[in-house]
Every structure is written in C-alpha cells, then in structure tokens.
Regions:
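Structural detector of well-ordered beta-strand residues that form the stable sheet scaffold
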Residues: 106-110, 182, 222
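A glycine-rich, often tryptophan-bearing local segment used as a flexible ligand/cofactor-contacting loop or short
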Residues: 89-160
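Catalytic beta-strand/loop cores that center a nucleophilic Ser/Cys/Thr
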Residues: 138-217
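Extracellular ligand-binding/catalytic regions of CAZymes and related secreted enzymes
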Residues: 25-29, 34, 53-57, 190-191, ...
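Helical hinge/lid and interdomain linker segments adjacent to catalytic or ligand-binding clefts
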Residues: 27-37, 42-119
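Sec/Tat signal peptide C-region and signal peptidase I cleavage site
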Residues: 20-24
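Bacterial N-terminal signal peptides
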Residues: 8-19
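Positively charged n-region of N-terminal signal peptides that target proteins for export
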Residues: 1-8
C-alpha cells in the first residue's frame, strides 16, 4: 500500500467512526407508560411489539414501562411521554410533581383512550391537561370517524371518513377554548344511548370530538379517545394516527399552515 493509499484508508476509517454514530442517531426519545388496569389489561401485549416496530420504522428511541418506576426519576431526557390506556391517577406524590415539572419545561404528552378518564378530585391538573372532563361511554360499537383538521400530523394517513369500532367516550365542556379538534364521530352511525342497565348515555350531538391537541402549561398535548381493544394495535392506519401525535408532541413540528 502506497503512503497516499494508506492515508486515504485511515481517513476513511476515521470518517466511519465519526459519521457512523451520527447517522444512526435517533431523532427523539419517548417514554410509553402502558400499565395494565381493570378494564384494559390485554392491549399492552399486542401494543408493545407494534410500538417497537413503530420506533424502528421512524427512528426514535422508546422506553416501554409496565409500571410507574420511570416517574421516580427526572423526566427531562424524554421528548414525549405516552400514557397508553394509563390514567394519570397511576402516578402518586412526587411522580405527579415530576410530570408537572416536565410539562412546564416544554415536554410533550400523548394521552390515549383510558388516559382520558381522569379523576378531577384526585388530580385536577391532569384533567385540565386532557382538556375535557370524562362523562361516560356506551357499549363498543362501529361508528364513522370524520377528519375535521387535515393539517395535523395525526390525521395525515387517515381517510376523510373512517369506519372504526371502539368505545365512544362522552365529555363535558372543555376547560379551554384553545383545544383544536382533529377528529369527530358521526353519532348517526351508532347508538350513543346503548349502555348498561342503570346507566345513562345520551351522546354529544353533531360535534362529538374523539381527538384533539392543545398547548397546556408550557407543554404540547395530543389526546385521542381511540384504542380500547387489543386488536386495534394491529391496525396500521391507527398506528400512524398515534405516531402523528407522538411526532408533534415530541418535536412541535408537522402542522401544515392553512
């Protein structure tokens, strides 16, 4: 090998050592809290490999948590935290304070399905983070979802009208006028009054939101009511819906200006 070739060879190795890790650098870091609970205990076994594949496909680092232990440490290293069928009430004491500090420092939160059922008497801050107080839901039924905001990443992969089977949550009035709804459900496509004996559900009328986003207390919050049954986590369109919310919550990017 000539001296010039040797120099070129050494430079190539040096470049590979420097450039290789940079090329493999993942774009952001996400904590997924998926804690089984009374009515949602089977979903996580299906969701975990689906989220792992999502992380590989979209090149982000994911930490999966079956319990609240990650909230015992500083959360600043995460760009977004996903409460996957996991209500805020799972967090206790200082864990709650760490989440509040994280959001106030500009962190992103994604709340999925069961996470929307907050208990205002236990943690009013988390219910305001969700944006609306939960009321009830009827039996699982098929309904038609309508995209009302095409400009948000969580709707980019969705058809304008989307046939979907889930629990259709009902809520009270929003805590803030700043909630930006991206999906609604057409109540004429299912029976909003079909509920267990002794309970009452009456729907929300023409404007029944199922997904929205807002900025709250310094952080970026994406909320979707979709995601009750385990089978839904095998649906590629649904997973793109979730990823769109994660992407925005983690980066603040992707909203198309009208």
């Amino acid at each position: 090998m000539t001296p010039m070739n040797k120099i070129a060879f050494l430079l190539a190795i040096a470049y590979a050592l420097v450039a290789g890790p940079a090329y493999a650098q993942q774009q952001f870091k996400v904590l997924v809290a998926a804690i089984p609970n009374k009515y949602h205990n089977d979903y996580a076994v299906v969701a975990k490999p689906a989220f792992e594949q999502m992380a590989r496909r979209h090149n982000f680092e994911m930490t999966w948590a079956w319990n609240t232990m990650p909230f015992d440490a500083d959360l600043a290293g995460y760009d977004a935290i996903v409460f996957l069928n996991t209500p805020g009430e799972e967090l206790k004491g200082e864990q709650r304070q760490r989440l509040e500090n994280y959001v106030r420092a500009g962190g992103g939160v994604v709340a999925v399905h069961r996470a929307l059922i907050a208990t205002p008497d236990q943690w009013p801050w988390f219910e305001r983070l969700i944006g609306r107080p939960f009321r009830t839901h009827p039996y699982i039924q098929t309904g038609v979802i309508e995209v009302v905001d095409r400009n948000f990443p969580a709707t980019f992969a969705l058809p304008y009208r989307w046939l979907w089977t889930d629990e259709w949550y009902e809520y009270g009035e929003p805590y803030s006028p700043d909630l930006k709804v991206v999906l609604t459900v057409d109540e004429s496509t299912y029976d909003p009054t079909l509920i267990w004996p002794g309970q009452k559900a009456e729907g929300m009328g023409k404007h029944h939101p199922v997904a929205w986003y807002h900025r709250f207390d310094g952080g970026r919050i994406f909320v979707t009511a979709l995601g009750h049954t385990p089978e839904l986590y095998n649906d590629s369109v649904y997973l793109e819906h979730i990823y769109g919310g994660i992407y925005w919550a983690a980066t603040g990017r992707g909203i198309q200006r009208k």
